[in-house]
Amino acid sequence: MAASLAGKKIVFVTGNAKKLEEVIQILGDKFPCTLVAQKIDLPEYQGEPDEISIRKCQEAARQVQGPVLVEDTCLCFNALGGLPGPYIKWFLEKLKPEGLHQLLEGFQDKSAYALCTFAFSTGDPNEPVRLFRGRTMGRIVVPRGCRDFGWDPCFQPDGYEQTYAEMPKAEKNTISHRFRALLALQEYFSSLTPGVGDDHPSWGSGEG
């Protein structure tokens, strides 16, 4: 049961140190478990975002034989019917941020949304995988800002003049799709362990 995980380690499936750093910063010191990063080779599933997240989490839990947290991020262009969506990783590798912007060159609609899904498994195959989602609306722009974090340079959230890459990390971490998904995750764990997360400095900033 998830309620019995307080104080224990959860394997966060990532080989990206910056991603782990950002997740820990957002969750804060009130999160009842310790996240440890571990790179795991998972199959590249295809399908809808929820389906992909569940299958990846189930496979990660099978390999780890314990509690795991798996993150999937989609960048969805409305003009392209939601693409690249869960396949943004390969689009970014081939096209870079400039190419992502150029994909929409022939479209008036530059709107997009960033979707983050965290899938959590206790490690027990008989328990369902739980999904926690966060979405931030924005638009695709000419890349600006630091190039050390994926497609951040070409995504400008609604209501802001800066791209994700131009924002101070602390500011980005109060509006991002990742923040919103982690807020849902934190609230779930807080409901299992009363008093946890009550004093998080960013609470209330993530609901749009």
UniProtKB/Swiss-Prot annotation:
In its UniProt entry, what is this protein called?
Inosine triphosphate pyrophosphatase
Signal sequence, start to end? none
Record keywords, A-Z: Acetylation, Cytoplasm, Hydrolase, Magnesium, Manganese, Metal-binding, Nucleotide metabolism, Nucleotide-binding
Cite the NCBIfam families for this sequence: RdgB/HAM1 family non-canonical purine NTP pyrophosphatase
The coenzyme or cofactor needed here is:
Mg(2+); Mn(2+)
Which reaction does this enzyme catalyse, per its entry? ITP + H2O = IMP + diphosphate + H(+); dITP + H2O = dIMP + diphosphate + H(+); XTP + H2O = XMP + diphosphate + H(+); N(6)-hydroxy-dATP + H2O = N(6)-hydroxy-dAMP + diphosphate + H(+)
For biological process, the GO terms are: deoxyribonucleoside triphosphate catabolic process; nucleoside triphosphate catabolic process; nucleotide metabolic process
InterPro entries linked to this entry: ITPase, ITPase-like_fam, RdgB/HAM1
Relate the assembly described in the record.
Homodimer.
Gene3D superfamilies, alphabetically? 3.90.950.10
Give the highest taxon in the source lineage: Eukaryota
Q: Which organism is it from?
A: Bos taurus (Bovine)
Per UniProt, the enzyme's principal EC class comes to: hydrolase
Q: Does the keyword Methyltransferase apply?
A: no
Q: Can you tell me which family this protein belongs to? A: Belongs to the HAM1 NTPase family.
**Ligand binding (Mg(2+)):** 44
The residues that hold ITP are: 14-19, 56, 72-73, 89, 149-152, 172, 177-178
Q: Which GO terms describe its cellular component?
A: cytoplasm
